[in-house]
Amino acid sequence: MKISSVCLIFFLFIGHLAAQQPRMSGNPIIKGWYADPEGTIFGNQYWIYPTYSAPYDEQVFLDAFSSPNLVDWQKHPRIIDTSAVKWAHRAMWAPAIVKKDNHYFLFFAANDIQHSDQEGGIGIGISDRPDGPYKDYLGKPLLNKFHHGAQPIDQFVFHDKDGRYYLIYGGWGHCNIARLKDDFTGFLPFKDGIVFKEITPEDYVEGPDMFVRHGKYYFMWSEGGWGGPNYRVAYAMADSPFGPFKRIGVILKQDPHVATGAGHHSVIKIPGKDEWYIVYHRRPLGETDANHRVTCIDRMYFDARGFIVPVKITREGVAERDLSK
């Protein structure tokens, strides 16, 4: 009888401890092959907009995922596809999204153009809902030319603290910044008359991202080849979105015990908190297909001087974080 009582107390204690442990997201956080994730928050929901990771001719749509807590994710399939964008035929990549004037603007690259005479580049979808469906906003690419050697892909829309919106983009080892018109129908020249300013830092390849913390502009990007194990994320800091950006170092990379090819990321900040998450893709151990990439999330921290602490990629992911509480 005493043994049964002791066992009951023990199991009740273990159950109490388990109830106190936060649920973890696990990594990857969504099922399927997805890369280049754009993470953001709309209302009390987290959203992720990734690239469908497949051969270019199969990349003819974009899916989205939403969650109230970083643990339970809902898939929103085909929020936009090439049937809605007549000039897009393949290689729909690296979505970036902003909400403005009660509309959601989904920026994406399509067709993987190799020179300015080809059809394709960076386009915009528009919807009155974050889960779409999105229709072609302009009926043509927003940007379809090479400037300063930058392939028009990997777009990021940066909303500065003065209210201005900038397009930061570029592949092939070059990155440009351009000020968007208020209605996103084109670009406004800077005071010197230049429309596209190159801000390429050392070792930049693709996948730019920018945010502001404590008055400093953090510029992040991916280095290495996306199909290899050494894909990684580095960063720089400056007092302006135009730099100059001097490379500080790598903050996200492979862990031979966890995964390889960790890169092409985005950053989520909890509103009103100095609490940060990095959303990125990586390749599971043992996978040799370049397109076998999965979307993951981990915490991102800063040291006392404001430098980013190198991220530890994990299998556990992050703890449940409900935005409504």
Question: What residues fall within each predicted segment?
Answer:
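Carbohydrate-active catalytic/glycan-binding domains of CAZyme proteins
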Residues: 19-325
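Bacterial Sec-dependent N-terminal signal peptides
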Residues: 1-21
